[in-house]
Amino acid sequence: MTDNTYQPAKVWTWDKSAGGAFANINRPVSGPTHEKTLPVGKHPLQLYSLGTPNGQKVTIMLEELLALGVTGAEYDAWLIRIGDGDQFSSGFVEVNPNSKIPALRDHTHNPPIRVFESGSILLYLAEKFGYFLPQDLAKRTETMNWLFWLQGAAPFLGGGFGHFYHYAPVKIEYAINRFTMEAKRLLDVLDKQLAQHKFVAGDEYTIADMAIWPWFGNVVLGGVYDAAEFLDAGSYKHVQRWAKEVGERPAVKRGRIVNRTNGPLNEQLHERHDASDFETNTEDKRQG
């Protein structure tokens, strides 16, 4: 189907009302829109995030570290409501000039170290604590291969397929077909890799799995975009096997609900400041 009713202007101008439900999450310029400092809790690591796939990567990693007894990985997870423009506060922009979640401050250093971009945070935590990134050069490189594969693939799955299939106010056949093809190609790449290995980068659970699961694991398990049937997710049997196994890890079950503001109330922990919050402060408890 061809729709030629839209003709781009010679010079694009921003229509603030055109973004619909997403009008407040982005702008064509950078920098803060308002003055507001970020809160700081009691733990060494201060995370400012939202429970999207990119946010889940980091909270899963932190919960995995804590599960190993790494006390230095204790963290406060502060909710950044991107629909309300929290990411454009002066405090947040100071941590991440790109105004995207997640963003991390490590207060074990003076001055604190800022870390932004989810892949960078995973790598920082892996190197800081010495877990989930192999020391062997070949294994480390393979892990990095897949971490960067995800960083390149996620925009096609999320901003491309997820947006036009699930969120866009108008269903555009060309856009959906284009990004569905790429989503399925990426799933096939991952499926073939997992046919040969228990985890994405080999036989070890690494930051590659933590990066990829919130995107591709959630998609095939029906956790995002309501697209599992449309994508014929059941046909990717190796991705299904891996997604279910990783999803059963206790740290993944915890990490995936931190800073989450949608879905079942018992799977929403808006902020995490203590391990006990998983038992006492999920939204079903708070609203019950």
From Swiss-Prot:
Binding annotation for glutathione 2: N26, R178
Protein keywords: Oxidoreductase, Peroxidase
GO molecular-function terms, A-Z: disulfide oxidoreductase activity; glutathione transferase activity; peroxidase activity; protein homodimerization activity
Additional facts recorded: Binds two molecules of GSH in each active site; there is one tight and one weak binding site for GSH.
Subunit structure: Homodimer.
Role of this protein: Exhibits a robust glutathione (GSH)-dependent disulfide-bond reductase activity toward the model substrate, 2-hydroxyethyl disulfide; the actual physiological substrates are not known. Also displays a modest GSH-dependent peroxidase activity toward several organic hydroperoxides, such as cumene hydroperoxide and linoleic acid 13(S)-hydroperoxide, but does not reduce H(2)O(2) or tert-butyl hydroperoxide at appreciable rates.
Protein known as: Disulfide-bond oxidoreductase YghU
